[in-house]
Amino acid sequence: MPSFSTQSITRPSVGVAIGPDGIYRALYGWYGNEQPLEIDKCSYDLSTCSPVVSSGPTIGDGYGGFYDGTNIWFSGSDEANDQGVVASYNPSTGAFNYAYYPGNSTKYVIKIFYYNGYYYLITCCDPGTLLKCTNPLNPSTCTQLNINAPTSFTVQEYYMYTQGSYALLSYFQKNMNNKLFSLCNFDGTNLYNCINIYSTTGILHYLHHSLLEEQYVEII
């Protein structure tokens, strides 16, 4: 039988990535409770963990991560300073780098994804945006994608799911009297084969989160 390990973590939010030499976890704060980013390297069975980055940039809500073959990436938001944060750690060299993305009091980098040679940064909220980058550590390499949507709606949030050559993009939109959840195939620039669901209740917001934030895409 495989062993099962548990650990107690005092941080409110955690990001996890499978690296070439172990499991990497990022320890964050929470919304309104920003804390310095800590990155730990753990054994694959999670029986042991030790810090490789003890004190990084301050992050509240944090997410991630993934390994792109060179770096492990994490991201989050620093609401107190009105900015988003993207951070990378190189398991081979130990190099740690990060970049700030200025917010506008409602918009922060929330999640970073890798698909087909590009990095995608999703910001939230009201409106949310989707950035396509060649180097997330240099915000000048990012361009904002314009996702076609009904003009009467404002995109509140985006989420993305990638697996190999396949990508899905979800976005939740709202106006004063209606709400729209869309789940689409994504080729890196454009959407196609979208499923659109309208409602006047808040249930679509929860559907949006459960499908892609928790990656329950197999039910589609």
UniProtKB/Swiss-Prot annotation:
Keywords: Capsid protein, Virion. This is Coat protein TP4. It is found in: Virion. It comes from Thermoproteus tenax virus 1 (strain KRA1) (TTV1). GO terms for cellular component: viral capsid. Its main location: virion.
